[in-house]
A protein has these predicted regions:
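A ubiquitous, low-specificity "background" feature that marks scattered single residues
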Residues: 9, 44, 115-116
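A small-molecule sensor/coupling module
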Residues: 112-120
Length: 123
């Protein structure tokens, strides 16, 4: 069946925290172009965007300053590539059945995003 791609990082206790591939937009880059680049940089998979999954918008504190962050999420389909962690920040990458994605995700905001996204099999 259809699968979803997650990246994993090991925490201090050795547990794997699974999350959606993500990264920062570079100067002059669209959110879509950044997403395609980050997926390939983190996982080795070349993909194409099939639809937007929405935006997570939030504030957090860092070094005593309030930081505003906007995260764009997209649904992809795989084009080519060999699945393997490509950068040091990613410890492991793996495919999961689509109906397991939400429960595998370590972060509540990503779980909510997937829950709101409807049928991931539909472009």
């Amino acid at each position: 069946g259809e699968r979803g791609l997650l990246i994993g990082r090991h925490d201090k206790r050795g547990r794997t925290l699974w999350s959606l591939p993500k990264g920062h937009i570079e100067v002059g880059e669209t959110p879509e172009a950044a997403a395609l680049r980050e997926v390939e940089e983190e996982t080795g998979i070349v993909s194409k965007i099939t639809r937007s999954l929405g935006v997570i918008d939030f504030w957090f504190m860092a070094d005593g300053k309030r930081i505003h962050k906007t995260v764009h999420h997209f649904l992809f389909s795989e084009v080519s590539g060999d699945l393997a962690p490509q950068i040091s920040e990613v410890d492991v990458v793996d495919w999961f059945p689509l109906d397991e994605i939400a429960t595998r995700l370590a972060y509540p905001d990503e779980r909510k995003l997937i829950a709101r996204s409807g049928d991931l099999r539909k472009p």
